[in-house]
Each structure stands twice: as structure tokens, then as C-alpha cells.
Amino acid sequence: IEKAVWRLTGELGEWFGVDAGLLTVGKRADIVVLDPQRLDDSLNQYHEAPMEAFGGLQRMVNRGSAVNHVLINGRVAFSGESFAAELGQTRGFGQFLRAG
């Protein structure tokens, strides 16, 4: 498991040349906490969700029911089944990372 996580995080960060993919003191803390028991075929099922900013227009989404929590830059962005109210509204949840 440890090597698989490294291949999907640290190794990709190195390959793209971005300062990401490692949990190290003083670095960004972008973390996804998931329940491996809930990793199943439901991820491939079709789901729609409304986009409130566009009058409720429906969009296709993936439902990651195995995902329990998401932290971006050390701040809780998602927990349980809801997003943080400040996500997308305030600064501090991350930034664009340029390769190289």
C-alpha cells in the first residue's frame, strides 16, 4: 500500500516537477482520507449534481463514497458529505502549481 500511495503522490510530484506529493513539515498538507472498504464499482456509476451558481444546471459528477475527508493546504475542504462553506469563497485552499 505504501508504495502504491507513493506512486500516485510523491512520484508524480517529482515527475511533473511540482513541490507536492509529500507530507513534510513546512509543506502544503493536501490530504484525502478514504475508507478502502468502500472502494468499489459505484465510482463508475452515472450521477448528476446541480451547479447552484448556474441556476441549478445539472452536471455529471463522480461520487467518491469512499472519500471521508479532504484537506487542502491543511484546511478542511470536505468532511462527511459536505464541502466547507468557505471553499471557493476565500483564499488559502491552494494555488495553481506550475510544472518545472
Where would I find each of the regions flagged by the language model?
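Active-site microenvironment of metallo-dependent hydrolases
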Residues: 1-100
